[in-house]
Regions:
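N-terminal export leaders
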Residues: 1-3
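OB-fold and OB-like single-stranded nucleic-acid-recognition modules
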Residues: 6-171
Length: 171
């Protein structure tokens, strides 16, 4: 996957590492704990009114970027309420993603960009979509966040060198 990233532009998400920091534009905060109704009933998980009302609107989410064994697919990554590491080679489709997982998508003109994993709690702002979406590989997501084009930027040469260094030392 690292070589594929070398062939495409590499994105550095310009996310806010400090959850107390004020975003540039005030979007309502949506918490992962507000995604579904609890307790879970006999019909399984049901989306909450707060999640349904946020559909199509700009929201601010605070959580963790999922660390994927093979790296995220270009132009997208998973975002969860807790740190998660996926081992696609060992687990296949039986991953440990929580129900409140968001598929984050870069702007369409950034769809070829690879996104390096960002550790720690981060905040993202974008337009929320709610509903079943199936990817070409068959993975189904129920909640998606479309980032605005200004949410990401290309890496400078020093950031890129640091990224390559971390790939050499990741375990």
């Amino acid at each position: 996957m690292a070589f594929q990233c070398l062939q495409t532009a590499i994105a550095q998400t310009s996310v806010t590492q400090d959850p107390g920091a004020t975003p540039m534009t005030a979007a309502p905060t949506l918490r992962f704990s507000d995604f579904y109704l609890f307790p879970v009933g006999p019909l399984g998980l049901e989306s909450s009114p707060a999640l349904r009302q946020a559909a199509g609107k700009q929201v601010l989410l605070t959580g963790y970027m999922v660390q994927q064994e093979n790296g995220s697919k270009p132009g997208q990554f998973f975002f969860t309420p807790r740190p998660v590491q996926m081992s696609e080679h060992a687990d296949g489709d039986a991953d440990d993603l929580p129900p409140a997982t968001v598929l984050v998508k870069l702007a369409p003109d950034q769809a070829a960009w690879c996104i390096p994993h960002t550790r720690g709690l981060i905040q993202l702002q974008g337009t929320l979509s709610v509903g079943r979406q199936e990817a070409p590989d068959g993975r189904v997501t129920w909640v998606q966040l479309q980032l605005n084009p200004e949410a990401t930027r290309g890496m400078n040469v020093f950031e890129f060198a640091g990224y390559l260094h971390t790939l050499q030392h990741s375990h």
